[in-house]
Amino acid sequence: MERSLIILKPDAVQRGLIGPILTRIEQRGLRIVGMKLMQIDESLARRHYAIHEGKAFFDSLITYITSGPVVVLVVTGKNIIEIVRSMVGATNPVKAAPGTIRGDFALDIGRNLIHASDSPENGEMEVSLFFRPEELVEMHRSTDQWIYE
């Protein structure tokens, strides 16, 4: 099973979108195995977004992600990376399809509400940045038999 890190960014928290976004995640049948409200400090932000270091938007990205509380969660499941990214929508909300989180709730690329891991390898790396193993729960729901083959 793959794992994906999802971050509901400061704009999602400030706009009161935690509930609607979590509802979509749960209604889709995704299994949440870790979740916390936290403030990302600059050191963690720089490690998480290290791939973007040196790009023109890097400093503003760090300022943005550290500007307020975020909700960080880990979801797990078969093909979870692809599923979550299709739910999230294009990075630029202008290009995000209606029905996606960004397509329905975001308007600007600089305030695009949500982060999701882009590969199984990055998912594992990102999960380890934000969660200790003991913070994650092994969860099996009675509905799993109706979701996964």
Swiss-Prot record:
Necessary cofactors: Mg(2+)
Binding-site residues for ATP, renumbered to this chain: K9, F57, R85, T91, R102, N112
InterPro entries: NDK-like_dom, NDK-like_dom_sf, Nucleoside_diP_kinase, Nucleoside_diP_kinase_AS
Entries under PROSITE patterns matching the protein: NDPK, NDPK_LIKE
GO molecular function, one term: metal ion binding
Documented EC number(s): 2.7.4.6
Reactions mediated catalytically: a 2'-deoxyribonucleoside 5'-diphosphate + ATP = a 2'-deoxyribonucleoside 5'-triphosphate + ADP; a ribonucleoside 5'-diphosphate + ATP = a ribonucleoside 5'-triphosphate + ADP
SUPFAM superfamilies with a match to the protein in the record: Nucleoside diphosphate kinase, NDK
Catalytic site: H115 (pros-phosphohistidine intermediate)
GO BP: any one term: CTP biosynthetic process
The keyword Metal-binding is annotated on this UniProt entry: yes
NCBIfam families assigned to the protein according to its UniProt record, in alphabetical order: PRK00668.1
Functional note: Major role in the synthesis of nucleoside triphosphates other than ATP. The ATP gamma phosphate is transferred to the NDP beta phosphate via a ping-pong mechanism, using a phosphorylated active-site intermediate.
Protein name: Nucleoside diphosphate kinase
Organism of origin: Roseiflexus sp. (strain RS-1)
Lineage of origin: Bacteria, Bacillati, Chloroflexota, Chloroflexia, Chloroflexales
Name of the encoding gene: ndk
